[in-house]
């Protein structure tokens, strides 16, 4: 049976890493769209649009078409938000992983290999707002290789790296729609610290919430 190997990133991994990141982020579009539909303002717009057109046109078809168009526009808004984030990330740290993570102090980027194929990624670097912590970033595993313990192995790699360098904790940020990630982090001992809206206009419009988690390494060591 093939084994999982966690190793440091190499330049030849670049395209695979970008693909894993892009596909992983794109998976959250459907759940984010459903999150948007559950928001009271969205439901009010849909209801008012339907009722207003039904009353004014005396036709059932027109309001149905109008609501369909509003839903399509809402989904495109979600797609735009994720595509913008993906594009920004690919142009920033993921465009120069070696320079961003491997050549900087207390930073690193790892990939997970399964049967010689890169199927997962994770990284960490110092957090600007929490000097005593390293921040876990870019955690992603191919859909075809989930439920195999790869994500846990990647998270443990970051925790060990952080502990070895004398930092007190690992922090990370995930979104309210990433329920599987939340379950994983909480299972591994991370505690939810706070929730906050994405500061951009679209994030506020969608009521898209980010969650900050923290793993206290001293307590984690005692529990183990």
Where are these regions (language model features)?
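A short beta-loop-alpha structural element at the N-terminal edge
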Residues: 5-16, 43-44, 65-69
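Conserved GNAT acetyl-CoA-binding A-motif
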Residues: 134, 155, 162-174
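Hydrophobic adenine-recognition pocket in adenosine-nucleotide-binding enzymes
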Residues: 9, 139-144, 174
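Acetyl-CoA-dependent GNAT
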Residues: 22-32, 36-137, 195-198, 216-220
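C-terminal "cap" of GNAT-fold acetyltransferases
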Residues: 171, 175-224
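Conserved acetyl-CoA pyrophosphate-binding loop and the N-cap/start of the following alpha-helix
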Residues: 144-145, 149-157
């Amino acid at each position: 049976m093939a084994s999982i190997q966690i190793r440091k990133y190499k330049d030849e991994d670049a395209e695979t890493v970008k693909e894993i990141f892009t596909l992983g982020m794109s998976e959250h579009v459907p759940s984010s769209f459903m999150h948007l539909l559950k928001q009271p303002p969205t439901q009010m717009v849909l209801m008012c649009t339907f009722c207003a057109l039904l009353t004014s046109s005396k036709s059932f078809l027109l309001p149905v078409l109008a609501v369909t168009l509003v839903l399509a526009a809402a989904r495109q808004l979600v797609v735009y938000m994720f595509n913008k984030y993906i594009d920004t990330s690919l142009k920033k740290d993921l465009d120069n992983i070696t320079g961003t993570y491997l050549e900087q102090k207390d930073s690193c980027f790892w990939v997970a290999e399964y049967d010689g194929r890169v199927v997962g990624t994770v990284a960490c670097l110092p957090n600007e707002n929490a000097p005593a912590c390293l921040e876990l970033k870019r955690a992603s595993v191919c859909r075809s290789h989930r439920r195999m313990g790869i994500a846990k192995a990647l998270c443990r790699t970051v925790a060990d790296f952080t502990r070895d360098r004398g930092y007190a904790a690992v922090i990370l940020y995930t979104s309210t729609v990433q329920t599987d990630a939340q379950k994983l982090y909480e299972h591994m001992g991370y505690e939810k610290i706070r929730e906050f809206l994405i500061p951009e206009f679209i994030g506020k419009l969608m009521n898209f919430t980010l969650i900050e988690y923290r793993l206290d390494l001293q307590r984690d060591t005692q529990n183990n």
